[in-house]
Amino acid sequence: MSFICGLQSAARNHVFFRFNSLSNWRKCNTLASTSRGCHQVQVNHIVNKYQGLGVNQCDRWSFLPGNFHFYSTFNNKRTGGLSSTKSKEIWRITSKCTVWNDAFSRQLLIKEVTAVPSLSVLHPLSPASIRAIRNFHTSPRFQAAPVPLLLMILKPVQKLFAIIVGRGIRKWWQALPPNKKEVVKENIRKNKWKLFLGLSSFGLLFVVFYFTHLEVSPITGRSKLLLLGKEQFRLLSELEYEAWMEEFKNDMLTEKDARYLAVKEVLCHLIECNKDVPGISQINWVIHVVDSPIINAFVLPNGQMFVFTGFLNSVTDIHQLSFLLGHEIAHAVLGHAAEKAGMVHLLDFLGMIFLTMIWAICPRDSLALLCQWIQSKLQEYMFNRPYSRKLEAEADKIGLLLAAKACADIRASSVFWQQMEFVDSLHGQPKMPEWLSTHPSHGNRVEYLDRLIPQALKIREMCNCPPLSNPDPRLLFKLSTKHFLEESEKEDLNITKKQKMDTLPIQKQEQIPLTYIVEKRTGS
């Protein structure tokens, strides 16, 4: 397992990431993976002897004594099944795990293969990249579950219609003479039961509509609201895919690029090891690697996955990449896009009713605008963003399980978010309250994944995966960051002392004229 490395002093304001092994001073880390229909990919790094924290002097530093070589090869030709009677405990995602092929005695195949360039290279991040890391999310903030284009078009039209109707009702009421207003009030009092019955019928129809459009996920067992048909949503997904392809058409890596092959290899391995999971085999998975410093990755409902090279430079090993790609697979398999679209449409419909009431009741347009702004913010921060965080947490949970079934070191998932949190703290970035974000905070993600890892380790054992190496990479990361901070403090202290020494006053030596010395001697 690898982690953050090559960190320079905080005074330099640079952070470096690279694939490297958790070895002592000079080690080799070979991560190989194979799957049907994919080329074999190996990530191989030679780590130079540690000579300090400078980039030109070292590639990484760690604290493991002795020699350590880690080889990992995934075999996709695993057959057979292992029944599980604890489907509820493994999140109802599968009832069987594929096991190692008997031809290989169910042992991890150890061999070295031709190396390809790594997914990430050691490089200093620019200020723009640092800002991107701070805002990093595995899926775009508002496109993790993309809203269909039709709903995006209808939303402003619905809002405008509600404002016009509400304002029209207010103007009509204000224009009525007092006697007419009394007549209207009297009619309302006489027909209050009819109005109550009408509103109750509307509410009942709404409840019936809601429950008849619920669908239970076969993976999580959770009910979700689906308002659009699968065919309609497929067409909308194709439109969105074409829009993304048009935007990135000049930045796509070729299929022969080493980074593309590496991502494809990991994705193919995840799909192969989880083909028994409902929905995965029904999706045609296609990978697109975009040459861009943007640190992001997202998947469309039709299985089109977009990964940016900036994202690849931010992960430190295959295990982290497996978890993050599993997270994106989970978004697509769980139907988060369709679910988010249905929930947004429902909230917009209810919001349109409240908006009409606001513009009808408020006596002035300025007050109505203020109430409308408050209503939109309440909807955003009390419903939309919490719901988005819920979907992200669910994708983390299922993505962790998919990575566990693929025999990845799932402890790396927690390390990744610790890295993101460390970058924020290293640059003094203030922590934004989680309720303001569409994604869980890095720290909360670390805690959540750490709670899930023991269960995922059991699933990994059920799938006859090879045992994980010790020590725990989470512990190593904490030791590394602690050591780095101590070294940074020492370096900053030395710089401070040097500055103080440079600023000390130096006594000026007066030049005594030679004639003065001669006169003094002759006089004596």
Swiss-Prot record:
Its membrane topology: Single-pass membrane protein
Activity regulation summary: Protease activity is activated upon autocatalytic cleavage in response to mitochondrial depolarization.
Highest taxon of source: Eukaryota
Annotated segments matching region Cardiolipin-binding: 148-167
Post-translational modification: May form a redox-dependent disulfide bond. Exists in a semi-oxidized state and is activated by prolonged hypoxia.
Protein name: Metalloendopeptidase OMA1, mitochondrial
Record gene name: OMA1
Region (Stress-sensor region): 165-195
Active site as annotated: 328
Function as written in the Swiss-Prot or TrEMBL entry: Metalloprotease that is part of the quality control system in the inner membrane of mitochondria. Activated in response to various mitochondrial stress, leading to the proteolytic cleavage of target proteins, such as OPA1, UQCC3 and DELE1. Involved in the fusion of the mitochondrial inner membranes by mediating cleavage of OPA1 at S1 position, generating the soluble OPA1 (S-OPA1), which cooperates with the membrane form (L-OPA1) to coordinate the fusion of mitochondrial inner membranes.
Residue positions assigned to the propeptide: 14-143
Entry's cofactor comment: Binds 1 zinc ion per subunit.
Gene Ontology annotations for the cellular component aspect, listed alphabetically: mitochondrial inner membrane; mitochondrial intermembrane space; mitochondrial membrane; mitochondrion
